[in-house]
């Protein structure tokens, strides 16, 4: 370990990275309170003492049109960071997510003799697997949230450390379902279904009608069924309300602004789009069905690019179909409702599933902030 105070360079490109960066800085300061942190940081990282050469919002652009509009600025920032980090010679550079920006930067810094870490593996195990070779050239170490990610990197001899998942650390093994119900105004004994049609406009457009029709079918069987629908922002809420007015105008439900985790915790089952929400739902111990639909050409292309047997993280973690995945033409109200029925019923199917959810939760609950900090410090030796 260097005798001088550590200097650690970091680049975070979005809110999730800011949260991870702040947790990492906190854990590092416990071991090295005099360490210096510099780079691209959001408000949480800055509140932990990171000196921001650029604000995180400069990198937080999504979509091809937005990226093209900001390309000159993004390239300038990357060149400037390369120059300034090379002059600074930090003990280690940590690129937090934002792979399109960070992996190239990591490669340039590694060429200058600076140790580099990429924190949060891109989904190379699922598609565009050849990216693993670029990552291997650019980084000294990848920090992975999930055990199957490390197994993938091991196949290609790319140094990778499984650190557990921060979300698993944040959520209790045994959730407080009744506290979530009190917060949402749901009766303690009510039967409750959560609908989560996604966070993107295209997802809400493609999934909402089928999800609403599924809820109507289930309400015919369970007339007292409570339905909660968390929506990530006012735009998605307005979009969902417009679809509901056409498809299920008279179906009673609780529309929530945000509160996705509370909805999962409070519900007996959930119908959701794939993605991080499926992992969060597993950690909330809420049985789920994954439904997903996309434009036909996009689905055709995805089937040829994606190299995994499953799309949802619970199934990838379990290595088998733990939760039903009804994709594209299978994503139909009758089939979705049939898959949800045994999850709403209190019985052995549900109990076995919840026990497996708890086992998987333990497998990825490793205190990720401390594990990440330990990996950073080992590389500084």
Swiss-Prot record:
In terms of SUPFAM superfamilies, this protein maps to: UDP-Glycosyltransferase/glycogen phosphorylase
Which UniProt key words apply to this protein? Glycosyltransferase, Lipid A biosynthesis, Lipid biosynthesis, Lipid metabolism, Transferase
Return one GO MF term. Answer: lipid-A-disaccharide synthase activity
Q: Which GO terms describe its cellular component?
A: membrane
Q: Does the keyword GTP-binding apply?
A: no
Which pathway does it operate in? Glycolipid biosynthesis; lipid IV(A) biosynthesis; lipid IV(A) from (3R)-3-hydroxytetradecanoyl-[acyl-carrier-protein] and UDP-N-acetyl-alpha-D-glucosamine: step 5/6
Which superkingdom is the protein from? Bacteria
Role summary: Condensation of UDP-2,3-diacylglucosamine and 2,3-diacylglucosamine-1-phosphate to form lipid A disaccharide, a precursor of lipid A, a phosphorylated glycolipid that anchors the lipopolysaccharide to the outer membrane of the cell.
What the entry lists under NCBIfam families is as follows: lpxB
The family this protein is said to belong to: Belongs to the LpxB family.
Task: Report what the protein is called.
Answer: Lipid-A-disaccharide synthase
Taxonomic source organism: Erwinia tasmaniensis (strain DSM 17950 / CFBP 7177 / CIP 109463 / NCPPB 4357 / Et1/99)
Q: What is the lineage of its organism?
A: Bacteria, Pseudomonadati, Pseudomonadota, Gammaproteobacteria, Enterobacterales
């Amino acid at each position: 370990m260097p005798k001088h105070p550590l200097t650690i360079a970091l680049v975070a490109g979005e809110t999730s990275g800011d949260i991870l960066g702040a947790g990492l800085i906190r854990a590092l300061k416990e071991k090295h309170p005099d360490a210096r942190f510099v780079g691209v940081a959001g408000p949480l990282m800055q509140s932990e003492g990171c000196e921001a050469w650029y604000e995180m919002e400069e990198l937080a652009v999504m979509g091809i049109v937005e990226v093209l509009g900001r390309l000159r600025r993004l390239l300038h920032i990357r060149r400037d960071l390369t120059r300034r980090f090379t002059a600074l010679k930090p003990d280690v550079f940590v690129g937090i997510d934002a792979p399109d920006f960070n992996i190239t930067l990591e490669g340039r810094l590694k060429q200058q003799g600076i140790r580099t870490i990429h924190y949060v593996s891109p989904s190379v195990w699922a598609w565009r697997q050849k990216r693993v070779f670029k990552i291997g050239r650019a980084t000294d170490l990848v920090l992975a949230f999930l055990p199957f990610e490390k197994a993938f990197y091991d196949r290609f001899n790319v140094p990778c450390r499984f650190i557990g998942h921060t979300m698993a650390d944040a959520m209790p093994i045994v959730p407080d379902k009744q506290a979530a119900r009190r917060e949402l105004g749901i009766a303690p004994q009510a039967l409750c279904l959560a609908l989560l049609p996604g966070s993107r406009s295209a997802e809400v457009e493609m999934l909402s009608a089928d999800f609403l029709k599924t809820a109507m079918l289930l309400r015919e069987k369970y007339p007292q069924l409570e339905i909660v629908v968390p929506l990530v922002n006012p735009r998605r809420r307005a979009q969902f309300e417009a679809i509901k007015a056409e498809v299920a105008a008279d179906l009673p439900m609780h529309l929530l602004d945000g509160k996705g985790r509370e909805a999962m915790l409070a519900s007996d089952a959930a119908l959701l789009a794939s993605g991080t929400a499926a992992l969060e739902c597993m950690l909330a111990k809420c049985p789920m069905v994954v439904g997903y639909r996309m434009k036909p050409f996009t689905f055709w292309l995805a089937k040829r690019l994606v190299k995994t047997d499953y799309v949802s993280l619970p199934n990838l973690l379990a290595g088998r179909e733990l939760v039903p995945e009804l994709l594209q033409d299978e994503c139909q109200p009758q089939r979705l409702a049939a898959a949800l029925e045994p999850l709403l019923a209190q019985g052995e199917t549900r109990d076995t599933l919840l026990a497996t959810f708890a086992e998987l939760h333990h497998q990825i609950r490793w205190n990720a902030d401390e594990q990440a900090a330990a990996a950073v410090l080992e590389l500084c030796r």
